[in-house]
Amino acid sequence: MTYDFDLIVIGAGSGGVRASRISAGHGARVAVIEESRPGGTCVIRGCVPKKLLMYGSAFSAEAADAAGFGWQVAVDGHDWPELIDAKNRELDRLEGIYRSLLTNAGVELIEGRGLIAGPHEVAVGERHLTAERILVATGGWPQIPEVPGLAEHGITSNEALDLAARPDRVLVYGAGYIAVEFASIFNGFGAETHLVYRADLPLRGFDDDIREESAVALAGRGIILHPGCTLTGVTAQADGLKAVGLSDGTEIVVDQVMAATGRLPNTAGLGLKTVGITLGPKGEIPVDANSRSEVDSIFAVGDVTDRVALTPVAIAEGHAFADSVFGGRPRQVTHANIPSAVFTQPPIASVGLTEDGARSQYGEVAVFISRFNAMKNTISGRSEKTLMKLIVDTASDRVVGAHMLGPDAGEIMQGIGVAIIAGATKADFDATIGIHPTAAEEFVTMRTPRS
């Protein structure tokens, strides 16, 4: 059978664009369909704009810290619209780069919503296209929990990036990385910030020592924590404020209430069920190690598969798909030991197993932990601690987990990730000369395991 394309990709986010470009580079005829803006979640409404706001929010603390070093820095106010305009200009620039990457690779960009009409057919409005293979890369979308009034009066991360005005009082509902990052952002811009979550500690899935220290750090920055609570309802007041009820009986009045309790695969209305794909419990597309669905001609990468919802993972999966299917170089992406970071203030980073996970997998482990004042804080007067932790499989001496809370955690952890992927032992860490004075040198100078 003759097809219009060798590959149709639905979704021009990070994973879809990488798969499109590499496939075209291998000689495939490729079209990518996008209903919004090329760049997807990360570039348009996720990692990039969020980190730009995080950078902006950090200056208030920097100004406060400067006093200990002899600087008298007055923070008289902040021009929120100017920041949003600057952020939008950068997103426009990045979107243009994504469009150019597709054009230069020979990929046809089709704007509209793609609907899978058959194992080899995608409809975009009145246009019907055929391809030997279809790749779904539509990402994820914020979920809003079923709380009376929350959907009507609340916002998600999508809207939080484009608020017309900086809120003076905000409540963030959730305790995952998105929730704590936005709580840090709003707090840094001077908003009275409440963080409400069901568990005892934020950041479920991270190492417990990091979770405990993060709660201390968030509270130390002035964020008001409400652990063990859920929302019971949100009502709008005549003055435009929102009254938010908590399960402990508290009522909090805020300018904005943000739902950040998780994201779900963006599969609704794609026509997947009609072609024989049974979605998972979260709406995800189940795929094998080669990103192939139960329909042989349909593949999926990125957040839509609910494997590891991180942009670099989607990019790696898209690249591996293209090399395997069109490049004659079959390979798979391993989802173990993926470094990650949480861009709170202070930031958090992790790679490998948590202490509990390591004990479950290896049995006997040695844990090395250091909690100290960063050098800058000794003069700034900030009481915030830096926490570093290594987890070692006792039998092999391999370092199987590394965790950090403190300045530059993400930058430091990227290098530690290479060591763990390479199978470095604790002896290798011990034999490495540290760079002094840095916080990072602590990872190669911890000698005594925790009893």
Question: Residue spans of the language-model regions?
Answer:
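FAD-site-proximal beta/loop scaffold in flavoenzymes
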Residues: 150-167, 251-327
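Glycine-rich flavin
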Residues: 2-5, 21-28, 33-166, 199-203, ...
